[in-house]
Curated annotation (Swiss-Prot):
Keyword Cell cycle assigned: no
Descriptive protein name: UDP-3-O-acylglucosamine N-acyltransferase
Family that this chain belongs to: Belongs to the transferase hexapeptide repeat family. LpxD subfamily.
Keywords, ordered alphabetically: Acyltransferase, Lipid A biosynthesis, Lipid biosynthesis, Lipid metabolism, Repeat, Transferase
Matching CDD domains: LbH_LpxD (cd03352)
Subunit structure comment from the entry: Homotrimer.
InterPro entries per record: Hexapep, Hexapep_transf_CS, LpxD, Trimer_LpxA-like_sf, UDP_GlcNAc_AcTrfase_non-rep
Pathway membership: Bacterial outer membrane biogenesis; LPS lipid A biosynthesis
Organism this protein belongs to: Bartonella henselae (strain ATCC 49882 / DSM 28221 / CCUG 30454 / Houston 1) (Rochalimaea henselae)
SUPFAM superfamilies tied to this protein: Trimeric LpxA-like enzymes (SSF51161)
Active site location: H257
Enzyme Commission identifier(s): 2.3.1.191
Metal-binding is among the record's keywords: no
Length: 348
């Protein structure tokens, strides 16, 4: 369950409140006044715990759980013990997350590391920087020449914002983040160690060896984007590197120069996207996907973890494997290899 040492509930909710807030249907109204004060997994649930079950394969864990209420679908209702309030919904996990944001708002809204929203006298801020009145700049942060930072944004200790960069409203720039040659939209979160706008990997062979190609573009990060810890996004050579609105990028991802990522994409940890590749809106990349340079990935594409993408992918397709190919082809080839191995083993 939620650790109350770090996360304290912000308010008191009853089961009836939860049903009203989410639109879930409460099947047993006698539980209307039951108090919910924390969120839990089925296994760790205790007094006052709210849980969710979205798939039947996890429903057996309801038996013996100490939770007082559960979000579930209609097909799971018959598995719920009589001791629990039943909140029926087609989206259990989404409704569970909504209540989590209400009960524990501090868990999704980064707070100042030193507890106060202020501009620290120990921050290093260039006199030409333009800061909105309610910006928080913590001790040890560095704000360069002509930087602009919008209202409600928090720049944490040891973050560095390079000259001429723009940071929008309600952004969170975590410790050890560096931002240079970049325009950042509103409600953007950059988590610890993220590096935005550094040189792209541009080199060319010359008479004296390997020579640097100047990187003269920018990084543009649109509204609502989240960039995970230690992720790196290189600025463009001439064209901009762009991360589209609402996209979420996990930890330890490398995005090379000139890459264009569409709106509301999900990119899991340890992916590497080579230069000048474009990824369409609403596409998803599993962990450790590698994408070659100058590839065009369409909208609504799903790519399995560990895949190596060497060719363009049309809209709406699901690919996997290395080199990546459509799921059906990939599964057939894997099945064929297994069959060959089985035949050889039998012949021995």
């Amino acid at each position: 369950m939620a650790d109350t040492f770090f996360f304290t509930p912000s308010r008191r909710l009853t089961v009836a409140n939860v049903a009203e807030l989410t639109g879930a249907k409460l099947l047993n109204p006698e539980f209307s006044n039951t108090v919910i004060n924390t969120l839990s997994s089925l296994e760790s649930a205790g007094k006052g715990s709210l849980v969710f079950v979205e798939h039947r394969k996890f429903s057996d864990a309801l038996v013996g759980s100490s939770a007082v209420a559960v979000f579930c679908t209609n097909e799971i209702v018959f598995k719920v013990p009589e001791s629990m309030a039943i909140l029926v919904t087609s989206t259990p996990q989404r409704d569970f997350a909504q209540i989590g944001r209400i009960l524990f708002p501090d868990s999704v809204k980064p707070m100042p590391w030193f507890g106060q929203r202020e501009i620290s006298p120990h921050a290093h801020i260039h006199p030409s920087a333009k800061l909105a009145g309610d910006v928080c700049i913590e001790a040890g942060a560095v704000i360069g020449r002509n930087v602009e930072i919008g209202s409600g944004s928090l720049i944490a200790s040891t973050a560095v914002i390079g000259e001429n960069c723009r940071i929008g409203c309600d952004c969170y720039i975590a410790p050890k983040v560096t931002v240079q040659y970049s325009l950042i939209g509103d409600k953007v979160h950059l988590y610890p160690g993220a590096c935005i706008g550094q040189d792209g990997f541009g080199y060319i062979g010359g008479a004296s060896g390997i020579e640097k190609v100047p990187q003269l573009g920018r990084v543009i990060i649109e509204d609502g984007v989240e960039i995970g810890a230690n992720t790196t996004i290189d600025r463009g050579t001439f064209e901009d590197t762009i991360i589209g609105e609402g996209s979420k990028i996990d930890n330890l991802v490398q995005i090379a120069h000139n890459v264009k990522i569409g709106r509301y994409c999900l990119i899991a940890a340890q992916c590497g996207i080579a230069g000048s590749t474009s990824i369409g809106d609403m596409s998803q990349l599993g962990g450790s996907v590698g994408v070659a340079d100058h590839i065009v990935i369409g909208k609504y594409v799903q790519i399995a973890a560990g895949s190596g993408v060497m060719n363009d992918i049309p809209d709406g397709e699901k690919w996997g494997g290395s080199p990546a190919r459509p799921f059906k082809q990939w599964f057939r080839e894997v099945a064929a290899l297994r069959s060959i191995g089985k035949v050889k083993k039998e012949k021995r």
